[in-house]
């Protein structure tokens, strides 16, 4: 459901960006954000095919790894209740109007003066709606590979680790009070 701040597949997608940054680019990203409009279909219970992954993630988006300030990361996190999925290390509390009262990454408040590594998609890195928020990243690396290919590999990895099972969940990353 693209109108909610969390979905099982949206959460898996954001976690998959963290995994892809680490496994394919040797980068330990602090945060991942995936736009909710980029997830276009659900994946039904049962065997997951490449066609299922392509239907869910039909756009030719690349992985974009950004280094940004904590101040700009906070600004990006304010968009989460409206249209972004985040990785499990992020906890965000907002009211129904979108006012964010709490954001933590790995249990810590975001430090305006610290730098953070963000795994996202080039759609977010290049989209005017986000570039004004992100400012000029301190560093940026874009992949040649498409996100859907990374996510397909992530789903295989999860299946291998969990006796063939992949389970997405809504787990309280984003709480609307």
Describe the role of every protein-language-model region:
Residues 1-6:
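Glycine-rich phosphate/diphosphate-binding loops and the adjacent beta-loop-alpha structural elements
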Residues 7, 11-177:
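Feature captures C-terminal
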């Amino acid at each position: 459901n693209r109108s909610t701040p969390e979905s099982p597949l949206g959460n898996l997608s954001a976690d998959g960006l963290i995994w892809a940054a680490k496994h394919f680019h040797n980068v330990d990203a602090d945060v991942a954000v995936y736009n909710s409009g980029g997830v276009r279909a659900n994946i039904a219970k049962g065997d997951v095919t490449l066609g299922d992954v392509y239907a869910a993630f039909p756009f030719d988006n690349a992985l974009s790894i950004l280094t940004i300030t904590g101040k700009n990361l906070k600004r990006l996190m304010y968009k989460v209740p409206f249209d972004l999925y985040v990785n499990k290390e992020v906890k965000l509390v907002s009211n129904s109007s979108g006012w964010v009262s709490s954001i933590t990454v790995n249990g810590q408040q975001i430090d305006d003066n610290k730098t953070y590594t963000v795994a996202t998609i080039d759609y977010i890195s290049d989209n005017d709606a986000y570039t004004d928020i992100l400012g000029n990243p301190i560093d940026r690396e874009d992949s040649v590979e498409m996100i859907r290919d990374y996510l397909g590999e992530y789903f295989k990895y999860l299946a291998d680790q969990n006796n063939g099972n992949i389970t997405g969940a809504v787990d309280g990353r984003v709480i609307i009070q």
